């Protein structure tokens, strides 16, 4: 009899508890607030709540886990994440929000921007840093071009400035002499570092320290040893010539741009930037050897060619804009790089100063860059 009474009591208690929980559940579904504590609430806290983390681009400093109450969202049991509607006002920014991203891109397109389709959030892009030098000695040769070409032919300025710099990782490898060679061309003049033996360089083109027991500086920074300059070069020596031919036909201006490249150089990452009058939309490109991009904010049309070599020493582009004065398409800026130089300065060998020592292994980088190259 006692056992039967206890069983009936437990059944009645469970029924009351079930009714109570259903009432509390109804309060939650209607937006009510419950102060009940106990196992049921603890279970609900862990099963029905998900933590929203903010990214690096959020407005809370460096980002990370946001512990504000508004960044927590609850899902009723039995619903999948795809069926959840509405979000807390403080939920962190979703980097994959397709709707907002598309709206942003469409607004840029309306302004005339040419949008690259492989858009990625900048906070998630990995930026690879250049690899540190692996050889004990690294030689860096670089020439920079400062050129102003007249639109009707001839040059206002054609200046070439070069530098040979040395990077030595260890002091033990700094006791060396560098044998260099260069092309004998008119207008080429050298200037050595004050700590370089000038007589040795002028007589034998050997770079060595003025104090023979003093090694070249070591570390992670390059040390310039010699500089040079080439002046008096003419238009026939230009690595790249660019001509612009605008003509007005009716209510439109047809602009033909052409380039011709010298056989002396293979040019990499060529960008020809043509200024345009203020436009309401992107210019209409009718023909192009390469690719183009329109910068609506600066009103500049960029013509890019990945590589100019023996297969494409010349190329052209044609585009159409509303009527404009021919002077609006100048100055044209040109950028490129090459793996050889005008002077052909390079290190041909390294000799250790200590007798019986082996010369350290070295690598060499040679580069020509258009620092300021314009058609005016």
UniProtKB/Swiss-Prot annotation:
Per UniProt, the ranges with Gly residues bias are: 80-92
The UniProt record lists the keyword Transport: yes
The protein depicted here goes by the name Coatomer subunit delta-4
UniProt keyword Membrane, yes or no:
yes
Keyword annotations of the record: Cytoplasm, Cytoplasmic vesicle, ER-Golgi transport, Golgi apparatus, Membrane, Protein transport, Transport
Domain MHD: start-end pairs: 134-376
Q: Which organism is it from?
A: Oryza sativa subsp. japonica
| Subcellular location per the Swiss-Prot or TrEMBL entry | Cytoplasm; Golgi apparatus membrane; Cytoplasmic vesicle, COPI-coated vesicle membrane
